[in-house]
Amino acid sequence: MKLTKTALCTALFATFTFSANAQTYPDLPVGIKGGTGALIGDTVYVGLGSGGDKFYTLDLKDPSAQWKEIATFPGGERNQPVAAAVDGKLYVFGGLQKNEKGELQLVNDAYRYNPSDNTWMKLPTRSPRGLVGSSGASHGDKVYILGGSNLSIFNGFFQDNVAAGEDKGKKDEIVAAYFDQRPEDYFFTTELLSYEPSTNKWRNEGRIPFSGRAGAAFTIQGNDLVVVNGEIKPGLRTAETHQGKFTAKGVQWKNLPDLPAPKGKSQDGLAGALAGYSNGYYLVTGGANFPGSIKQFKEGKLHAHKGLSKAWHNEVYTLNNGKWSIVGELPMNIGYGFSVSYNNKVLLIGGETDGGKALTSVKAISYDGKKLTVE
């Protein structure tokens, strides 16, 4: 699809351009939101979520390439799994799926895909924590996983709902009790986890010095880790951002400034934002929240998003010299897609937009310090 070239001023006088002449990527065969993916060499892998038990690949270096379906994922349909690539293979962990009773449940299994023979293998291991709302990235020979919901609490909520049957009164009581808790009482994962495929071992890489998160944007570039926002309890996000660094003594963390609020709006934090690097600049965009939830929480309302409507966003933020700024906007709101850094661009693959509609689009954004380009 060709876009008309347009320029306008944005915050800090950055130029925002729709590019009509750059490479475009084909749409996904199906809309994929709440899925996962990874980059292996020049090939991107995306699947699961609203894509069912399917995975698709695209050769990014071939301008004429189309998406291709690979072997069916053997772990069944699931939402919000975690994936990363190590040593030319794709690893998929956890997620949320229905059991034989029809209950939505967190699962903690693990699978490996080998591109050389198009085969999946279930691994003889289980994640030590719940992996829904978790975010993963690879570094060296390990997969690092940050955040996630508590398996027992999350599963218990869905089990109780199914057990309540058609009793609306009981269901309302279960929902009220679930959301009327402090953030710390959900026991979101507060350790940085790692999985090393060569030894099939999980490792506790240390406690993070900030609250547990679900749906945070999490990236690793070189020795730097960046964490942006995420839920601190169901329905309530935070605007906090953090940076870590791999050192001989483990990961050392520091706080970054909060994500700024768009002009005329409050900043209620983001979950499901997409992030990556372009020309050395860290970019984060999209995500969803409940505007007004932080205000209600500060007023003492533990069910912070009660009565509020979910909103999806399109602002593009960049981190430069430890400071955040808004450098432009996407042509649509987006969240809960897959993002990957490639060829000095951040590809935004699938996701959802207003009302939760699944997207098939593949957009590319780039930033050179002065101009944001959206393709």
Curated annotation (Swiss-Prot):
Enzyme class per UniProt: isomerase
Statement: the UniProt record of this protein carries the keyword Flavoprotein: no
Entry's Gene Ontology cellular component terms: periplasmic space
Pfam families: NANM
Keyword terms, alphabetized: Carbohydrate metabolism, Isomerase, Kelch repeat, Periplasm, Repeat, Signal
Active site residues per record: 231 (proton acceptor)
SUPFAM superfamilies from the UniProt entry: Kelch motif
Subcellular location field: Periplasm
GO molecular function, one term: racemase and epimerase activity, acting on carbohydrates and derivatives
Gene3D superfamilies in the cross-refs: Kelch-type beta propeller
Kelch repeats: 43-87, 89-140, 142-176, 177-222, 225-273, 295-344, 346-375
EC number from the UniProt entry: 5.1.3.24
Reaction catalysis annotation: N-acetyl-alpha-neuraminate = N-acetyl-beta-neuraminate
Superkingdom per UniProt: Bacteria
Signal peptide: 1-22
Description of how the protein assembles with itself and partners: Homodimer.
Function: Converts alpha-N-acetylneuranimic acid (Neu5Ac) to the beta-anomer, accelerating the equilibrium between the alpha- and beta-anomers. Probably facilitates sialidase-negative bacteria to compete successfully for limited amounts of extracellular Neu5Ac, which is likely taken up in the beta-anomer. In addition, the rapid removal of sialic acid from solution might be advantageous to the bacterium to damp down host responses.
PANTHER family: LD33804P
Family: Belongs to the NanM family.
NCBIfam families (alphabetical): muta_rot_YjhT (TIGR03547), PRK14131.1 (NF010730)
Name of this protein: N-acetylneuraminate epimerase
Organism: Haemophilus influenzae (strain 86-028NP)
